[in-house]
């Protein structure tokens, strides 16, 4: 019985060695034909962690889980009219430029306001802008920019405005069933691999439509078929909630609106988290406002009555004064922002890392000293 088991083990080992050799040969041929890295073992990947770029909003970075938009992925931002979709996308453009990257904006709606974009921090002199005549042209331009590998972010505003050429050439009232869905499906198949290879972030802004005759469930849907829903790694639902009233002379005027951004799909972190931000008219997302709210909840900024203080120093009476103080002191803003990101695990604590490095260095020194002492005794 023991001899039979041993023989079976030898046969298994022999065939196992042959299979491994065959696999190694196949991998070598694949690398020769398609380049190094075409096939690899998951554990051999140099970068396991998904690379991200900040969305330009602290609250949204936290809701996204990974600390921002994942690079090399497709993002869909949708919501009702005037909810802040383009504002959210323009903050991403400003952030990409801030990090030294190149951004492109495919303005299919022909409605981009350069002055508003500049107010949000976008360098309009460096922004690549295209206003295509048809959906195919817009997607082809986006594809060529992505294939170049030189663009870090491409925004398409919006999918609903990507009108197929056949529909433009036809008459109003002609039936063009499924044209846009087929166009988007083909575009997603072509673009997805290139987006991943070049690590470009592709943001598609989309509108909402109502399904006719829906009695139960959510009647809302997005144009362009289902392809974008499947290919998107992140989908954001942007909804404006309540108006923000001004103070003093503007107490009867609306100066902004509170907005909820729900992460309805997320392939890189847990989904269904919500970011609550203030979108101020002419300014965009109030970064100081969201920082004060989040830092106060974490007790990084202390609140006593109407006063806000940090490290025992008062920074303002009322949220508006505290916002102005942080806006006037960017170094303090960055310090508090860093502490919040460390608290949520979006960044490593540099002080703790430095302390750990010091401890490790001292441990290495002790090991060397012990080795030297042992050698002397010998």
Swiss-Prot record:
The keyword Cytoplasm applies. Its main location: cytoplasm. The keyword Chaperone does not apply. GO terms for cellular component: cytosol. Keywords: ATP-binding, Cytoplasm, DNA damage, DNA recombination, DNA repair, DNA-binding, Nucleotide-binding, SOS response. GO terms for biological process: DNA recombination; DNA repair; SOS response. Signal peptide: none annotated. It is found in: Cytoplasm. InterPro entries: AAA+_ATPase, DNA_recomb/repair_RecA, DNA_recomb/repair_RecA_CS, P-loop_NTPase, RecA-like_C, RecA-like_N, RecA_ATP-bd, RecA_C_sf. One of its GO terms (molecular function) is ATP-dependent DNA damage sensor activity. It comes from the Bacteria. Pfam families: RecA (PF00154), RecA_C (PF21096). Can catalyze the hydrolysis of ATP in the presence of single-stranded DNA, the ATP-dependent uptake of single-stranded DNA by duplex DNA, and the ATP-dependent hybridization of homologous single-stranded DNAs. It interacts with LexA causing its activation and leading to its autocatalytic cleavage. Belongs to the RecA family. This is Protein RecA. It comes from Streptococcus equi subsp. equi (strain 4047).
